């Protein structure tokens, strides 16, 4: 049986990446700092995934174990030394925190003379996640380790897409997920191209697919949340049941389509259908996806290269409409949740500084015209 190391034993790790690895006949070592989850994985050695659709079928994932990276980093290093693949689903902000441990694992492979090619895939909601992780890992590698990594360790970028809502169950390992899933890996950075995962797509140039996903699903999902919150919706489904909100989301996706077609020459009809499927996914009655989950961390989501500001910048450069995206940015700046640190911090910034200064600080923009346009909607 092949061996995998997966960083992040949360719902996405278990409910998406774990399912794919299991179906490809991998033993999975989940690496996390959540003792409850790690203990349950080691005690049971398996968990269940429920597919949120009519009939609600279940999948039992077996051959799993857990390692607490805080308490037993040496076990993680040992696992990396012998593994066939490494994946992550921990969130973009957490990637730097696993870099040193990954570097130690790579050094252990070098010392052991393990020259089997290994790919590390960051399955995160970000553009260039694996390469970002590699830049962090390189900081901790010796000169010999760097040479070894360049020869034998690949960091191919990946695009992943599956809605896994916040949930709580008596069984801490049980997880409910939507039926749809998409995992795309770029081939040009693979070090082990012979290891192909079933139910994973491989593309030479990943960038069009990452942008299609991030600018469509992530932008559309966040739009649903911020506009939904403005109108008092508690769940994404509730937001979509409001015709006014649904129409606004469709208008945002129309602007995204114009960008993707102009930039990557996507087929218009295929893209329209892709966006239609996205709306249907948001409307899944078997999933309770809280607005608070999707809207959280607004400062990060309003970043220069994130799901709103980047497409707005590029649409402006192409002289294409971005009015509906601007309106959504206004709702994002207005979003408040007492349980979300970033939304509270955003409110504090707006109370202490001018709106324009906050827009510049949060978005990183220096285009004065665009800054003024955003200010108008806050």
Curated annotation (Swiss-Prot):
GO biological process entries: mannitol catabolic process
GO CC, alphabetical: cytosol
EC assignment: 1.1.1.17
UniProt keyword Oxidoreductase present: yes
Residues given in the record as NAD(+) binding sites: 4-15
InterPro entries: 6-PGluconate_DH-like_C_sf, 6PGD_dom2, Mannitol_1_phos_5_DH, Mannitol_DH, Mannitol_DH_C, Mannitol_DH_CS, Mannitol_DH_N, NAD(P)-bd_dom_sf
Reactions catalysed according to its record: D-mannitol 1-phosphate + NAD(+) = beta-D-fructose 6-phosphate + NADH + H(+)
Keyword Cytoplasm: no
A molecular function (GO) term: mannitol-1-phosphate 5-dehydrogenase activity
SUPFAM superfamilies from the UniProt entry: 6-phosphogluconate dehydrogenase C-terminal domain-like, NAD(P)-binding Rossmann-fold domains
Coiled coil segments of this chain: none
Entry keyword set: NAD, Oxidoreductase
UniProt family annotation: Belongs to the mannitol dehydrogenase family.
Full protein name: Mannitol-1-phosphate 5-dehydrogenase
Gene responsible for this protein: mtlD
